[in-house]
Amino acid sequence: MELADILDRAHVVALPMAVPFRGITTREALLIEGPAGWGEFAPFVEYGDEESAAWLRAGLEAAYQGYQGIDLGDRAVRINGTVPAVAASEVEGVLERFPGVGTFKIKVAEKGQTLIDDISRIAAVHTHRPDAELRVDANGGWSVEEAVQAATALADAAGGMLRYIEQPCKTVEELAEVRRRIDVPVAADESIRKAADPYRVAELDAADVAVAKVAPLGGVGNTLTIAKDLAAHNMSITVASALDTAVGIGVGLIVAKAVEMSMVGVTVNAAGLGTQRLFVEDVVEKQELRGGCLDAAPCVPDADRLAALAAPGERKDFWFDRLRRCWDILDVAGGSYDVPYG
């Protein structure tokens, strides 16, 4: 595997968002057409190179190794719908993008908004989908006291359907304190994928749920290993994406099904892999939801869509430069991409 070969195989795309997500209106990604399949490199633009190198590692694993030999069973993966931090009046339109889905993740603690906004959004979701299970994601946006206050208010707004609060605070220590003080289960996301030690959440009994995202954890092999280890500490598992294109979603679906098939006795929650429905266009046609499920299968982008969604030249240069820097980090680290599954 050589850098020049990777760049020759790369396509940079810009996908317009139907609904803004964390302030993003266009999602950019670098896709790699490798000998074993397609990989994705799309760390958010504010991420530094050290953190972003794990995303490159995951993309190279998909493109150059592939995932043959993983038991996918019937391939059906239950997903959750995702509701960005929209006004309550916009909730119904977002929900319509997820027919048949029985679980929704709702963004809260958005900068510039208040707890009242969050309560209204969650109440609107519950009104339109009263039988749906709900989870909220604060992305570390609260203090401990704010999280404790919010937990009660949001549980009430959810009408008894709130299943967990994801990453209420930034630090693992704060998560542990919040978990001790509230009745709603706590999920860890950033405290796993952005941490030097992803197992600290288990050591401090800081979470009931582990959110596992393939790209920031460095690939399928690493993700399955971390998920298995955290499940051994009585944590349930939610496999999720980081606003991936269909390429990354395809890999996430494979991991979600692999977790379900290989970890007997582990509670596997509906996967956070439905965000493709927040795009206006993607590199393939949106996969049809069947019974609230998507099929686990690798994605092969459509050539016409790749061309139509190609990013402008200066953005291609930005992503190529970023890939080069992250490649240097991986190369210095040893450049090993052979990771066993499980």
Question: Which functions belong to the PLM regions below?
Answer:
Residues M1-R135, N139-A158, V283-G342:
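N-terminal capping/lid subdomain adjacent to the active-site entrance of alpha/beta enzymes
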Residues I32-G34, F104, D137, I165, ...:
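Conserved, mostly hydrophobic/aromatic
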Residues F98-G102, H128-D131, T152-L162, R179-A187, ...:
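Glycine-enriched alpha-helix->loop->beta-strand junction motifs that scaffold or abut catalytic
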Residues F104-T114, E133-G140, G160-T171, V184-K194, ...:
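Catalytic beta/alpha-barrel core
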Residues E110-H128, W142-E146, P168-R180, A195-D197, ...:
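Active-site-adjacent beta->alpha loops and helix N-cap segments on the catalytic face
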